[in-house]
A protein has these predicted regions:
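Secondary-structure boundary elements
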Residues: 97-102, 127-133, 168-176
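Residue-level signal for well-ordered alpha-helical scaffold segments within enzymatic catalytic domains
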Residues: 51, 55-56, 130, 162-166, ...
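Conserved catalytic cores of phosphodiester-cleaving nucleases, focusing on short active-site segments
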Residues: 121-147, 164
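Short histidine-centered catalytic/ligand-binding loop motif
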Residues: 40-42, 74-77, 143-155, 197-199
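Hydrophobic (often cysteine-bearing) scaffold residues that line and stabilize catalytic clefts
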Residues: 45, 49, 160, 204
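Metal-dependent nuclease catalytic regions and adjoining charged, substrate-binding loops involved
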Residues: 82-89, 153-155, 163-248
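Coil-to-beta-strand transition motifs
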Residues: 116-120, 127-129, 186-189
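Metal-dependent nuclease catalytic cores that hydrolyze phosphodiester bonds in DNA/RNA
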Residues: 1-122, 226-232, 244-245
Length: 248
């Protein structure tokens, strides 16, 4: 397999990533369409704000600016829509503990296997005893999805950090604590740090171990993906027939 670096990390399709795995959990058909380039999602303003902050702290801001010129005015300043990114950065830099968490080895790329499936990870900040993932979010409120869920569960951050911890341990021989360093995009940004219990990470890892082989076979074209029937991709592929009529 190709040796992964920061430069080619997002180009490689041979490895499963945490983001890719979470896509498969949502909808197998949608995830495969994204991998094949058959379904391209529009980049949201919220995603770009988070990307700007991430790039700033990982010292990749100049590359980010070159890729996303639409964020900037002719004089190089951020457009009004994205100004909140500067407020978030300012708030983070005022907090010594947040800055400590983000001063580890940044954007560390590693590879390994889970249940025989090749995985790749790219971590925001790795300290001697902790893996830190930075999240720039709308807020930290629980999210409704057929009942309220904690934001970290709703967005699969437990899955993500479980993958990071497991693959990093394969490379380094030590299981490190996993934390989320969160800043919100509110007018007065909130800062929060969440430490995952090992029980939470172990439970999430079991999901990965159980599902990864199936998702890998879908990527290889050995089995057909199952659509959720609810996401935007599935709705775009829906073909009506007489049996789907609704009586009113």
């Amino acid at each position: 397999m190709e040796n992964l670096t920061n430069d080619n990390y997002y180009e490689n399709k041979e490895y499963m990533s945490a983001s890719q795995f979470k896509d498969f959990l949502k909808c197998e058909a949608y995830a495969l369409a994204k991998i094949k380039g058959e379904w391209i999602e529009e980049t949201s303003n919220a995603f770009l704000v988070g990307g700007y902050v991430d790039a700033y702290f990982s010292k990749e801001l100049e590359n980010f600016k070159l890729k996303h010129t639409e964020l900037f005015n002719k004089d190089g300043s951020l457009k009004a829509t994205y100004k909140i990114a500067e407020e978030v950065i300012k708030r983070i830099e005022q907090d010594d503990y947040m800055m400590h968490l983000l001063r580890g080895q940044t954007q560390l790329v590693q590879t390994g296997t889970i249940s025989g499936v090749p995985f790749k990870i790219k971590m925001d900040s790795v300290l001697d005893d902790t893996i830190v993932d930075q999240k720039i979010m709308k807020d930290t409120k629980d999210v409704w999805d057929n009942g309220y869920k904690a934001f970290w569960e709703m967005y699969g951050y437990d899955i993500q950090l479980a993958i990071y911890q497991y693959i990093h341990a394969q490379n380094e021989g030590v299981m490190k604590a996993c934390k989320l360093a969160v800043a919100t995009k509110e007018s007065s940004p909130e800062l929060a740090v969440y430490r995952f219990s090992q029980k939470t990470l172990n439970n999430a890892l079991e999901i990965v171990k159980n599902q990864a082989p199936r998702y890998h076979e879908i990527k290889l074209g050995l089995i057909e993906p199952v659509g959720c029937g609810k996401c935007a991709y599935c709705r775009s592929k829906l073909k009506l027939d007489e049996t789907m009529e609704k009586e009113i």
